[in-house]
Curated annotation (Swiss-Prot):
GO terms for cellular component: cytoplasm; exodeoxyribonuclease VII complex. Heterooligomer composed of large and small subunits. This is Exodeoxyribonuclease 7 large subunit. Its main location: cytoplasm. It comes from Stutzerimonas stutzeri (strain A1501).
């Protein structure tokens, strides 16, 4: 390690080039400031395509250039931006080409308020994405509240300022303090419980208030638990945390944000002068509306009066109308009577045409005609049937077995009356009957002889 970069330099006898000077200076800076921690605020942030990050780190009185090369920049989890307070670690070096000295960084982290600001922005984005800041969730403040709950510290100027405003502007309003810590480790839990208790009391409105302080002092109002407790309140709530320039997460979630606790009280405590002015305005509006209404009613009455006619004229018109209706009624009756007479005449004509006497005469004539035709038809029918019967009898005689028997043939019958068709159906000694054309004979079989029979050819 070079203990004294200038120990061999004789300024009276040796002249250095610019490059030599910058090189000696770089070695000196890197040797003495090999690793340092520096805290400041980012400005002039640049991100070229190479992946390196360049910015200026500054405080109120001075600034220094910083370089965060790609391999180290990849390890930084925070979103870098101008104005972010950070704490960096690195070595002091010198860029020989320009003679600028700079910090070559190997670590970067949020510093102080910078870390809190990152947490603030992260929670703000989360709750905004859930819709907790949307206007649709905001409740309107009551115009004339009677009971107001105040969630704040029981000591300090805040509660005194709020009470003073109400005494001056609206002494009739009942104020109730729900005490809570507004700073420190226990503040978050106490504020949440105080809000829940106040919301259950049925107040017309709530005030969540605290005086000014640093970001760390006001941090409990940026906790997610407090923000969700404010959002859960059914009672309209005004949030007044810190000074006018201080903005908390609770301010975004509340129904109304007031820049100061006194301003919150004034929002809920309209002054007597304001009320009197509003009353005067309402009175003037009422008088104007009454005058306008009376004027319109008077004009309407005049119009009705002009349209109103004398009763005698109305009676005369009604009498004329009655006469007209009477004439119309008489004409209608005459038309109805004539129409009825014409219809009656048509019905009489139809009735005469359909008289039963005429129908009976026609039926009687038809009966006489049919009576004269009946004997002839019966004789013709009987004659035809007789001829048909004779033809059938002749046909029957031709095919009758009796005709065959009359020609010398006979039929043998057994004791059951069944015809014997073959000699094989008989037995010697069997008694049979022989039916002839004119009678029957009892015969006995002496013997049966089967003989072949030659059938005639067709």
């Amino acid at each position: 390690m070079l203990k004294d970069p200038f120990q061999r330099l004789n300024l009276d006898r040796e002249v250095l080039t610019v490059s030599q000077l910058n090189g000696r200076a770089r070695l000196l800076l890197e040797d003495v400031f090999a690793q340092v921690w520096v805290e400041g605020e980012i400005s002039n942030l640049a991100r070229p395509a190479s992946g390196h990050v360049y910015f200026t780190l500054k405080d109120r009185n001075a600034q220094v250039r910083c370089a965060l090369f790609r391999q180290n920049a990849a390890r930084v989890r925070q979103a870098l931006r101008d104005g972010l307070a950070v704490r960096v670690r690195g070595k002091v070096s010198l860029f020989e080409g320009r003679g600028d000295y700079q910090l070559i960084l190997d670590m970067l982290e949020p510093a102080g308020d910078g870390a809190l600001r990152l947490a603030f922005e992260a929670l703000k984005e989360k709750l905004a994405a859930e819709g907790l800041f949307s206007a649709e969730r905001k409740a309107a403040l009551p115009a004339h509240p009677r009971r107001i709950g105040i969630v704040s510290s029981p000591t300090g100027a805040v509660i005194r300022d709020i009470i003073s405003v109400f005494r001056r502007r609206a002494p009739q309003v009942e104020l109730t303090l729900i005490p809570t810590a507004v700073q420190g480790r226990e503040a978050t839990g106490q504020i949440v419980r105080a809000l829940q208790l106040a919301d259950a009391q049925g107040f017309d409105a709530l005030i969540l208030a605290r005086g000014g302080g640093s970001l760390e002092d006001l941090w409990c109002f940026n906790e997610e638990a407090v923000a969700r407790a404010v959002d859960a309140c059914v009672t309209p709530i005004v949030c007044a945390v810190g000074h006018e320039t201080d903005v908390s997460i609770a301010d975004f979630v509340a129904d109304v944000r007031a820049p100061t606790p006194s301003a919150a009280a004034e929002l809920l405590a309209p002054s007597s002068a304001d009320l009197q002015q509003r009353l005067n305005g309402l009175q003037q509006r009422l008088v104007l509306r009454m005058r306008d209404r009376l004027h319109r009613d008077a004009m309407r009455l005049d119009g009705l009066t002009r349209r109103l006619r004398h009763p005698g004229e109305r009676l005369q018109q009604q009498a004329q109308r009655i006469d007209d209706l009477e004439q119309r009624l008489l004409r209608a009756l005459d038309r109805r009577l004539c129409s009825g007479q014409e219809r009656l005449a048509r019905l009489e004509t139809r009735l005469a045409a359909q008289h039963p006497g005429r129908t009976l005469n026609l039926l009687r004539q038809r009966l006489d005609h049919l009576s004269s035709r009946l004997p002839r038809a019966m004789q013709a029918n009987i004659k035809g049937r007789r001829q048909q019967l004779q033809g059938l009898a002749q046909t029957l005689n031709v095919v009758s077995p009796l005709a065959t028997l009359s020609r010398g043939y006979s039929i043998l019958l057994d004791d059951r009356g069944q015809a014997i068709r073959s000699a094989s159906q008989t037995q010697p000694g069997q008694r049979l009957k022989a039916r002839l054309g004119d009678g029957e004979l009892d015969v006995r079989v002496e013997d049966n002889h089967l003989q072949p029979v030659t059938l005639p050819l067709l």
